[in-house]
A protein has these predicted regions:
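N-terminal active-site beta-alpha-beta segment that forms phosphate/nucleotide-binding
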Residues: 1-112
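Anionic-ligand binding patches
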Residues: 84, 118, 122-124
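Flexible, active-site-proximal loop/turn residues at the rims of small-molecule/cofactor binding pockets
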Residues: 50, 122, 178
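Surface-exposed, charge/polar-rich loops and edge strands
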Residues: 11-15, 111-115, 125-128, 138-179
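Charged helix-capping and loop-helix junction motifs
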Residues: 61, 130-136
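Short beta-strand segments
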Residues: 47-49, 118-119, 150-152
Length: 179
């Protein structure tokens, strides 16, 4: 079921008109920047978005301009992930077509991260999410004590039964897509 929901939702996200996506991305980024959790955070962990996802470029730029420390994920086999300080000069394309920092990046300890901006494909009403199937964020969030937030399009909202290992996102910001 998760596989089908993931596939259908990604297809719908890719169908969003560019004009709608640009508007949605700007509004969601602005909303996130206004959150107390963001304003109070010294260190923000986010991700380098795929084209069909809510763009993180504006968020990263704004956070850096505000003097925040920004980190992005580096993944390893068996679903292990760690965050590395954002530096555009050390980004490399992975086998999944995703940009990630290389080994030269400075690791950021989980205890130093105040807010994690969590990616995902499908979200249900209690904040549980379906990602891309690697379990990276569910494993990482298991012991994370800071705040979590996601930014999504309304077409990503669907009800499903979470698994016992799934970790809920504390706050999900939604842009209501009208086509």
């Amino acid at each position: 079921m998760k596989k089908t929901l993931r596939k259908e939702t990604i297809a719908a996200m890719k169908e969003l008109p560019q004009s709608v996506k640009i508007q949605a991305d700007e509004e969601l980024t602005q909303h996130l920047l206004e959150l107390p959790a963001f304003q109070e955070a010294k260190t923000l962990a986010t991700y380098l978005s795929f084209d069909h996802e809510v763009s993180t470029a504006g968020l990263i730029q704004a956070a850096l301009q505000l003097g925040k420390r920004v980190c992005v994920p580096r993944t390893y086999p068996q679903g292990r992930m760690e965050f590395v300080e954002y530096d555009p000069d050390i980004l490399e394309k992975t086998r999944f077509g995703l940009l990630e920092p290389n080994e030269k990046g400075k690791l950021v300890d989980q205890s130093e991260i105040d807010l994690i901006h969590v990616p995902g494909v499908v979200f249900q009403s209690k904040g549980y999410r379906i990602g891309y199937g690697g379990g990276y964020y569910d494993r990482y969030l298991e012991d994370f004590t800071g705040k979590t937030v996601s930014t999504i399009y309304s077409i990503q909202q669907k009800e499903f039964q979470p698994d016992t290992f799934d970790q809920a996102v504390q706050e999900v910001l939604v842009y209501e897509v009208t086509l």
